[in-house]
Amino acid sequence: MAKLTKEQFIESLKEMTIVEINDVIKAIEEAFGVSAAAPIAAAAAAPAAAAPTEATVVLVSAGDKKVEVIKLVREVTGLGLMDAKKAVDTPPATIKENMNIEEAKALKAKFEAVGAKVDLK
């Protein structure tokens, strides 16, 4: 088989249709085990894939409305009065673990509405 120069290869590509060029690219990818995707695009996709899907809600501070926060902790966790009070009195306290990120944000908003400070981890 005769060896093609770069110029000859490019000239042969100029005579092909887009569909034929696409077939050549796929054949090269299969033959050499490589991808024609741009490295920048692959690097940009990585942070999107790393976006968290779960969060843990942690009570940092009860604020001024401690009684309201205790009631909310009981409602959310199902803890008894003493356990809920203990959690509120000794921050940081994990309220709920491994929640859907959207549910965790909604729960954080509930706590902030009664004056508590909450973090999502």
Swiss-Prot record:
Self-association state and partner proteins as the record states: Homodimer. Part of the ribosomal stalk of the 50S ribosomal subunit. Forms a multimeric L10(L12)X complex, where L10 forms an elongated spine to which 2 to 4 L12 dimers bind in a sequential fashion. Binds GTP-bound translation factors.
Keyword list, A-Z: Ribonucleoprotein, Ribosomal protein
Source organism (scientific name): Mycoplasmoides gallisepticum (strain R(low / passage 15 / clone 2))
An annotated GO cellular component: cytosolic large ribosomal subunit
GO molecular function: mRNA binding; structural constituent of ribosome
CDD domains for the chain: Ribosomal_L7_L12 (cd00387)
Identification of the protein by name: Large ribosomal subunit protein bL12
Disulfide bonds: none
Family matches, as NCBIfam families: L12 (TIGR00855)
InterPro entries linked: Ribosomal_bL12, Ribosomal_bL12_C, Ribosomal_bL12_C/ClpS-like, Ribosomal_bL12_oligo, Ribosomal_bL12_oligo_N_sf
Chain's role: Forms part of the ribosomal stalk which helps the ribosome interact with GTP-bound translation factors. Is thus essential for accurate translation.
One annotated GO biological process: translation
Family per record: Belongs to the bacterial ribosomal protein bL12 family.
Pfam families for this protein: Ribosomal_L12, Ribosomal_L12_N
